[in-house]
Amino acid sequence: MLVKENIESNSFPSVEAMLASCRHETPICCLRQERIKNNARFFARTFPGKVLYAVKCNPHPLVLDACYTGGIKDFDVASLEEVKLVHARCSSSTLYFQHPVKARSAIRNSYGRYGLRHFAVDHHRAAVPLIRECETN
């Protein structure tokens, strides 16, 4: 699927054809969902460990959908907004809040509202506020 001017369209057979149809200087976002899905499938099948998609790389909903349908069911999130986005689209996914700096409200909401149970810390002292916020829920 190619996206032109934020409108989903399958009417362009290639990126070149889409670019040729443009007569103005606005940015164009092209997403190749099949390519993303096939790459996700390759990683999910051949990597020996658990494969996570880092939402920070590209949080576009069509990218998340392609990763999910390609077999990547778990996501590395770095903010409460990313938690909300993935939860809304892929509610059965396991999320991993890997960013080492997290606001207490982000911890509390991720744990209490969205059921996150996987958090990363970069030092044992950072675990104290994490544990406190999780215990209050």
Q: Each predicted region: which residue ranges?
A:
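A charged N-terminal "starter" segment
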Residues: 1-137
